[in-house]
Amino acid sequence: TLAGKYRKMHIPDDPGFYEKFYFTPGDIGFRPVDTSVGRLGVLVCWDQWYPEAARLMALAGAELLLYPTAIGWDPADAADEKTRQRDAWVLSHRGHAVANGLPVLSCNRVGHEPSPLAADRVAGASGIDFWGNSHVLGPQGEFVAEAGTGPTLLLAEVDLGRSEQVRRIWPFLRDRRIDAYGGLLERYLD
């Protein structure tokens, strides 16, 4: 049985992820999927970087934000650059959890995928190392469970009732100044 559908809204076009050549952005918006475990706000891969997407899922009644993804780095990147990339990824998820008072569950691919492009291989690019580090965050951005860089079955209990408790402490959704956010609909502001 199909519980629902979601079409990836943001399509990347950066080294190693030239998806705009193959995919068209989704056209059904940000709608949570009702399941037996709760209302799931699914944001696929690149969508997870956009706080607006997480917020729209929260406003539509999502009880959990789910981020299935395949993200990694060029193996030739310096160690400190790799750390910055992975830390920014986790930090954005923690920010989404806090800003929306929702648990965030992120599963990421692991392993190495060689570049399919002959030109990359000639230039010395070997492909992408997917960094794993799947995690479950509570509604205050705290780690509930975290995987390493290898294949892992990650299990965690998530208390959906905590979201309401956190939203009473931090009523960010209630206190939004929606009258002042018109500029978010513009590409740039003067």
Features from the language model and the residues they span:
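Cysteine/selenocysteine-centered motifs that mediate thiol-based redox chemistry or coordinate metal-sulfur cofactors
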Residues: P25-A60, S163-D190
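Active-site beta-strand termini and strand-to-loop segments that position acidic
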Residues: V33-S36, P139, V158
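CN hydrolase (nitrilase-like) catalytic-core segments centered on the catalytic cysteine
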Residues: C45-L154
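Basic phosphate/pyrophosphate-binding loop/patch that engages nucleotide-derived ligands
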Residues: T1-L2, G38, G95-H96
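Catalytic cores of transferase enzymes with a strong primary signal for eukaryotic protein kinases
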Residues: K5-G29, V33-G38, Q48, A54-M57, ...
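A short, polar/charged loop-to-alpha-helix boundary motif
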Residues: R7-Y22, T152-I169
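Residue-level signal for alpha-helical context at structural boundaries
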Residues: T24, G111, S115, V158-D159, ...
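A structural microfeature
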Residues: L2-G4, A145
